[in-house]
Amino acid sequence: VVEMRNNLNSDPFSIPQEVYDYYRNTFVKRGNSCYRKWFKNYKINKTEEIEKILNGEIKLNFDEILPSFDSSYNNPTRKAGGSLLNIIATNNPLVIGGSADLASSTIAIGVDRDFSSQNKLGRHINFGVREHAMAAISNGLAIHKLRPFCSTFFAFVDYLKPGIRMAGLSKLPTVFIFSHDSIAVGEDGPTHHPIEQLTMIRSIPNVDVIRPADANETKEAYKIAFSKTDSPTCIVLSRQALPTILSEKETEVSKG
């Protein structure tokens, strides 16, 4: 873009130095002061943990902590996803997120209770019916080394599509979880039936889209999503129960 503007003899986009100075002398100084105070208070009993969090160094052995599902498991992939997410979040203090007022339906729920002014260590965020803001907030959390997830019905992905696109462009590992992935949602009617949405999000650059066929593929999807560091993942899950397909091919989910 810079080269194109030069070729067109256009003025370069610039910010006056006094604007930089103003922000450095106000917001930056205030932020640094608050950060030092917070770090001093919090690290008393959690020095090692806080260092790992700030450096994004927490790694999980997913094969050890996540279960496999046998042929008797016959549930929606949203339910399998909810149980897997709970295990991952319990074992990784970086995982934080929530839904656009649909947590009970998408079953994408954070741990340590709701985040609030009274519970700032809570890792479930009630974003409200604000899909676009939810995606933007989640991307901001990813910039600061946390492992955010956000969730809504798949038919509503259009409301947060710009956030997914920005995550791809910015190489952020935000996890977008969508449930109610087909016309099988039934009684909700055509407003809740995703038709063209899958094609749309699959066309977004640098975004992985996984629509697992059963619980074991769902496990692989979550392993992939929470292992990546340079691109977002969309996990598309079902409302209706799906049979577990006993196969060794679920490990090939990462191949697309």
PLM feature spans:
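Conserved phosphoryl-transfer catalytic core
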Residues: V2-N25
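Thiamine diphosphate
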Residues: N25-V236, Q240-S247, E252-K255
